Amino acid sequence: MMKSVVAVLTGILLALGVGALSIFGIAAPFFTYFFGPELASTALPAVFVLFAAAFAFYFGGMVASYKAPSRRRLHGVLVGVGAFVISPLVNLVAPDPTVRGGDPFANLRTPEAFLFTTVLLVLVLTVSYVGALRGETLFAHNQAVIRRQKTRKARERLSEGKD
């Protein structure tokens, strides 16, 4: 059970790290250069946010799937689910009183924001699943390589013993 939790949390942390790196390390300098520092910090286009989330959660799902003890696809998808569960919980536990009277979901009150969040959720779950498939494939391949190496070493030891 603990390995499962660690696998999913590792995937979530990797996804958050890659997402932050792609937004603040790649996209932010681009927007700062072309649009100036005032506009770049507040008007990051949604397309780039969706791309960064897709890029990040693909790798997060892959890592969780690879590290999982069993049910690899499930662990990969749980990275996306976990991120979308943790975020509202943090908003409920620590609401910001300066944002619309302390409403933890103030940013979801408009239809556009709700639509964007729904698209983001579907994208994250889909990409996490694709990453989980890739992690499962990598794990199976690496296990096959390890088995072949062990078999070859065992044959070499047997052939050395006969000489």
Task: Describe each PLM feature range.
Residues 1-163:
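Juxtamembrane/disordered regions of integral membrane proteins
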